[in-house]
Structure formats: structure tokens, C-alpha cells
């Protein structure tokens, strides 16, 4: 067993991620649909986050490998996707987060991305976890829909034993019967007890997996309610996907926030985050 412990405060340049600090935003688009759209969404997020003083990391996937249908849009792929993400990083001087699906992808992705993401469905795959941890990049570990919050400790230990202590846990909902996800608010505190920054992926928590027969459905209208509830627990950050026209998005549009609503949405969460983290901590044991 490794003696290494996870970092309570994970640092990325000037950005500090911790449950007691102002929240950090991992935001952008679900999948890279086109380079022009990626630039448009990145610029919108960056401008709004500067106005609201929210630390920001741009998110987009180069491949959606777990689509419901063989005919569903997956993205530009590894080579072109890394190129586009690198262009966004250089043009806007913004840090990048993207997901990795197979062990061979970890090293080349980590050369561009500042944070590499372990997908929820793959979070128990030891070879993938080990390959990602060996890059020494910050790792955002999505909690699988089929795992209890306390089970995330095992994935942290795998990373620590490889020598990587720059770890983040991210809630994205738990399976509740068929085609449904729920978020257990008590799970946030359970994961925070592991002394790692905890994020909330409100976008994918709104999914109804397989709810549209050949693709996932979603409950976009409930995004504000769920985001407020999650952020009220006092978290290190929020994971959010947006689109100018969610109904025309090529992946997970039903769960995406309309880009025109981004600023008022984030302004509310910023105010809530400041309020909650200003409360005196109560000992209720």
C-alpha cells in the first residue's frame, strides 16, 4: 500500500482546486463537433468566467466511445482532436481537460491536456487507471453510475500506488432503475472525507441513459435545481456542458445548458458558493 496521500489542494498554474476554496469550472462542450464551434464556445466561457471571476478550464471530448448506436456521431478522433484542443489552449491561453478511453491514449493526450479525465464507465479498468496515473497529469475521476461513493477510495489508491497524488473525484449520478440517474447529496461528503477536491458533473447527472431508444435523453429544464443543490454542499468545482442550440447538438443535447443562459446560471452558482463557504462549520457528530 502506498504511503502517498492525495493532495487536498490540487494546483494548476494559478488555479487552486479544493472543497473550501471558491469553485472552479470545468466547462465547454460535450464533443468536438467542429473547430469553429469549439472556439466559439471556449471564447464565450472565457469571457463570462473573467467577468464573474470564476477559475476556468475548457472541456471537450475528441471521441465519444460509448454511444448507444454505431451510427452516432463520435467526434474528430484522437489525432485531430488533440490538434484542435492544442489550438484552443494556445489561442486563448486556457487550460484543457479531456477524457481518455484506452491506455495508449493517455501519454499523447497528457501532452496537451492539463487534466485528463477517467470516464465513469471505465473507472474500474486498472490498465487505463495505471496508464493515466503514470502521466503525472491531474486526473479527474468520474464516479461510475454503479459505484457507491465510498468505493471511489479504491480508484484513488490505484493512482497513489503508481505515484500520482493530483486527483479529483467527480459525481455524475447513480443508476436508479432503468433509464434514470439520481444524485445522492450525502455522497459528496463521503467523497470529501477522502481529502480530495470533489466536483459535480451536473450535465451528465441529468441524463436519462438510453431514454431516446438510440441515444441518451436528458432533463435540461432541471439543471438549475440540481446544480444549486449540489453546489450547496460546498464543492471544489462544477463540470458543465453547453451548446448554442442544444436541440441540434450531436451528443447529449438534452442535458446541455443553452449557451445564452450560461452567464446568469453561473452568476447564481457563484453567489451560492460564496454564501455556503462563508458559513461557520458546525460539528454535528
Curated annotation (Swiss-Prot):
InterPro entries: Aldolase_TIM, DAHP1/KDSA, KDO8P_synthase. GO terms for cellular component: cytoplasm. SUPFAM superfamilies: Aldolase. It is found in: Cytoplasm. It is an enzyme of class 2 (transferase). It catalyses: D-arabinose 5-phosphate + phosphoenolpyruvate + H2O = 3-deoxy-alpha-D-manno-2-octulosonate-8-phosphate + phosphate. GO terms for molecular function: 3-deoxy-8-phosphooctulonate synthase activity. Keywords: Cytoplasm, Lipopolysaccharide biosynthesis, Transferase. It comes from the Bacteria. Pathway: Carbohydrate biosynthesis; 3-deoxy-D-manno-octulosonate biosynthesis; 3-deoxy-D-manno-octulosonate from D-ribulose 5-phosphate: step 2/3; Bacterial outer membrane biogenesis; lipopolysaccharide biosynthesis. Belongs to the KdsA family. This is 2-dehydro-3-deoxyphosphooctonate aldolase. The lineage of its organism: Bacteria, Pseudomonadati, Pseudomonadota, Gammaproteobacteria, Moraxellales.
